[in-house]
A protein has these predicted regions:
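GST-like domain detector, emphasizing the conserved glutathione-binding G-site
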Residues: 1-132, 200, 245
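GST-like fold's C-terminal all-alpha helical module
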Residues: 101-219, 223, 227
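Acidic carboxylate-rich catalytic motifs and surrounding loops in phosphoryl-/glycosyl-chemistry enzymes
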Residues: 36-41, 183-185, 237-240
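Charge-dense, extended regions
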Residues: 232-245
Length: 245
């Protein structure tokens, strides 16, 4: 059976890693049998999660994993036209190459309170003797990545303004559709859910989260996918009733 290596589940969401959540959601949407083995990035190929083992085959990076799943098991995008595939790719790039950095800034740099929540969720599984060292090492590493990407060169207000533009675009593109590309889930939905649940459903507070919660169609979308594909989890609680005053 295919083995998915990812972070330990916490926060009442499928995974606190956007990309782990994306990959597991694709597996569930595609009806592919798998088992999960929790691990940390320092034990992973390329130093990143998720990665999979499929027999003797080992593969890292959610993009390459999903390409493998499409080829060997089931392609959720098989009915999309070339134009629809282009739209899907563009939206995934928005999620994974832009919105991602605003959420990472929220967790690793924005406030000490957010960092403590993030630190506990990721590093509490380590022995105390190495826990703080690993947390400091990875925090500095990710802060350098945020700066190198360019996001970290902006003020907090500017970073969240850019992230809110992404949220507005996602809400407008989804509209009143069941899924982003229509009536059936596609690869874009696996990615969108992974990123939206990690914005709306995690205990990391920021103006970006508040803005995302103000979008009724995005809240309903996250709850709909949670109920359909993660029956072992609860949908958004008070967030589902949230309305911006």
């Amino acid at each position: 059976m295919l083995i998915l290596y990812q972070l330990e589940r916490t926060w009442g969401i499928p995974n606190l890693s956007h990309f782990c959540c994306k990959t597991e959601t694709y597996l569930r949407m595609a009806g592919i049998k798998y088992t999960v083995r929790p691990t940390l990035p320092l034990f992973a190929p390329k130093g990143k999660l998720p990665y999979i083992e499929d027999g003797t085959f080992k593969l890292a990076d959610s993009r390459f994993i999903i390409r493998h799943l499409k080829t060997k098991y089931h392609d959720l995008d098989q009915e999309l036209s070339p134009t629809e595939l282009a739209h899907s790719l563009a939206m995934q790039r928005l999620l994974e190459e832009h919105l991602f950095w605003a959420t990472m800034y929220s967790r690793w740099q924005y406030t000490d309170a957010n960092w403590q929540v993030n630190k506990k969720a990721i590093f509490s599984v380590l022995p105390p003797i190495v826990r703080d060292f690993a947390a400091i090492f990875y925090r500095r590493r990710i802060q350098r990545q945020i700066l190198g990407h360019g996001t970290g060169r902006h003020s907090a207000d500017e970073i969240f303004e850019l992230g809110m533009q992404d949220i507005d675009a996602l809400s407008a593109y989804l509209g009143d559709k069941t899924y982003f590309m229509g009536d059936k889930p596609t690869g874009l939905d696996a990615s969108a859910f992974g990123f939206l649940i990690n914005t709306l459903g995690c205990p990391i507070e920021s103006p970006l989260k508040e803005h995302a919660l103000s979008k009724a169609n995005l809240r309903n979308y996250v709850n709909r996918i949670t109920l359909q594909y993660y029956a072992d989890l609860q949908p958004l609680g008070k967030a589902a009733e949230y309305t911006r005053k």
